[in-house]
């Protein structure tokens, strides 16, 4: 992930993901584990929210790119209606920000990625 000053043509900061797929393969099931940002990012209050193909969801400072926090979505969940569900790859749709909440879809299984299908909500207060 890179922040660029388009007027000056300079890279202001960059953030590189660690490759953790070797350790995640047992969790990936039949899906493939790929490292990378693929879904669009979202920004609110100088914080950038981004999901990865290997199931990580993180918040970063827009000033310097430093990671503020990270949540691993590749796991099982008990949903609000009592059904079990699983998270996985974050791809296609980016985080949606409404008021003091960020919503993310985890478990996008297209193109052989790690399936599941949950919507997760994070408070940004």
Predicted regions: what they are:
Residues 1-37, 42-92, 96-125:
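Extracytoplasmic/lumenal domain signature
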């Amino acid at each position: 992930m890179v922040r660029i000053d388009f007027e000056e043509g300079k890279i202001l900061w960059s953030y590189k993901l660690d490759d953790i797929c070797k350790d995640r393969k047992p969790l990936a099931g039949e899906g493939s584990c790929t490292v990378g940002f693929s879904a669009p990012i979202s920004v609110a209050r100088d914080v950038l929210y981004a999901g990865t193909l290997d199931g990580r969801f993180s918040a970063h400072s827009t000033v310097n790119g430093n990671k503020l926090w990270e949540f691993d979505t590749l796991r099982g969940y008990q949903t609000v209606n009592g059904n079990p569900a699983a998270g996985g790859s974050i791809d296609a749709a980016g985080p949606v920000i409404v008021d003091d909440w960020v919503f993310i879809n985890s478990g996008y299984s297209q193109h052989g990625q790690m399936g599941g299908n949950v919507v997760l909500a994070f408070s940004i207060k």
